[in-house]
Structures are given as C-alpha cells and as structure tokens.
C-alpha cells in the first residue's frame, strides 16, 4: 500500500490561543483573522504567483492539539447535543484518522515584503493559533459551490445565534472596536458545549491578548460579557 509522509508548508497564526471559542466552521465569524506564514523551505514568492486573482482559499490543516491513539468509528457531534452518535466519516469531528481539517477562508491581502517571507492575510478562520498547514488551494466557485447540497443532520439541528450584551465595566477595557466586533460575533455563536449550559457560571474565553469573561442565559438567548482582562503572555500573532 502506498504511504506518504507530509510536512507543514506553513503555519496559521490567529487570535485563538485555546480551543474554547474557536468557531465551529470556517466563515461563521467573517472577522476572525489569520496570517499564513510559510516555512523557510516554501517561502519562494513564485509559489504564490497568481494567488491574488482569487478571493478565497481552501486550507488543508492538522488538528495539532488532538491526540487520537486509535481509530474510533463513532463520534458524538456537538450539534446533536453530545447524545447521539454518527460515523466519523459522516461528521466533521476533529477526532478522526490522520486528524486533518479543511477550511475555506477569504484572502484579505498578500504581503510579500516581510522578514518572515510571504504572508497571506485571511479571514473567516476556525483554527487555533499555531496550526500547521499542509496545503493551500484556490476556491473555485464554479466547481466547489453546490447550492443544491443536503446538510444532513446539520440541517435539522442548526445553531441559533444569541444576543451579546456588554456590561459597562467590560466596555471600559482597552479593546479596539474591530476586536470588540469580532468578539461579539464569536460569542454570538455560543461557544459552550451543548451538554454544558450551566446558568450563572462565569466562562472565560481567550482571544488575542484579551481574556473575556461572560455569563450565559440559555432561556433568554443571551450572553453577557462581564469583564475583559488584557494579558500579553502567550500571544503569538505575527507582527
């Protein structure tokens, strides 16, 4: 049987320093930005020639924080509340053979004159900071878009967005408006696990250099940001 060893061609840098809060799919939070920085072996600008002709990219990447020791044929999709099982190949679960992810992102700009080689600035990401990227391909609307496609069980169990409220104290933080809007849209997706909807519990989410604390009311369909703490350690965004 043919086997092939692959290596990262680039690293994705994002504001998501931990798994909690990462959008469940790419494109759900259009403002979520990322920077694709190529490994030294692949920093030749010729490898990107013509990429600006496209608006979106397919990113093939690895779930680097998941350690799958053995093959598990059944998984519990979060969309089903963590109670029903589906075949791993019928889901987008990160706990899968080879641990590969596939995301569609928008190209914001391509930066060629950088000390780190070419950098592709993208948005709509759903990846952890430091995620290894194994391949990049242009998104082709004429062949990759299928409006008639069925969403399977996902169509019957859609995520409802929630209303995000800021307490006055949280609004006094030094968070800029762009980051504030991004955080609102991240929390509007309700990052809590379907089986963990405790009321009055204070949750914490790290985004960029900020630690955002919030409470949720599932009955009212709201998330209230109660505090924002700035912390500069562990933030790896490329300058």
Name each region found by the language model.
Residues 47-101, 195-199:
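Active-site-adjacent substructure of cysteine-protease-like catalytic cores
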Residues 2-8, 95-105, 208:
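Short coil-to-beta-strand transition motifs
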Residues 15, 110-113, 125, 136, ...:
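Residue-level recognition of beta-strand microenvironments
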Residues 217-239:
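Enriched for short, Lys/Arg-rich terminal
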């Amino acid at each position: 049987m043919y086997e092939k060893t692959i290596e990262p061609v680039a690293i994705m840098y994002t504001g998501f320093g931990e798994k909690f809060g990462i959008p469940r799919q790419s494109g759900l939070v259009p403002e979520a930005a990322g920077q694709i920085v190529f490994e030294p072996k692949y920093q030749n600008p010729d490898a990107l020639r013509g990429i600006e002709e496209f608006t979106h990219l397919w990113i093939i990447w690895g779930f680097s924080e998941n350690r799958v020791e053995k093959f598990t044929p059944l998984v519990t999709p979060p969309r089903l509340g963590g109670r029903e099982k589906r075949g791993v190949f019928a889901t987008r679960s990160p706990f899968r053979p080879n641990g590969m992810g596939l995301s569609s992102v928008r190209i914001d700009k391509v930066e060629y004159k950088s000390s780190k080689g070419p950098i592709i600035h993208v948005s709509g990401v759903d990846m952890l900071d430091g995620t290894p990227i194994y391949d990049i391909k242009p998104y082709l609307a004429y062949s990759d878009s299928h409006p008639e496609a069925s969403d399977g069980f996902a169509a019957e169990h859609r995520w409802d967005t929630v209303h995000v409220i800021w307490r006055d104290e949280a609004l006094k933080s030094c968070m800029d408006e762009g980051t504030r809007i991004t955080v609102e849209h991240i929390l509007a997706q309700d990052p809590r696990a379907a089986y963990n909807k405790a009321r009055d519990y204070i949750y914490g989410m790290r985004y960029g250099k900020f630690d955002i604390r919030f409470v949720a009311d599932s009955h009212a369909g709201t998330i209230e940001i109660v505090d924002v703490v700035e912390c500069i350690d562990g933030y790896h965004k490329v300058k």
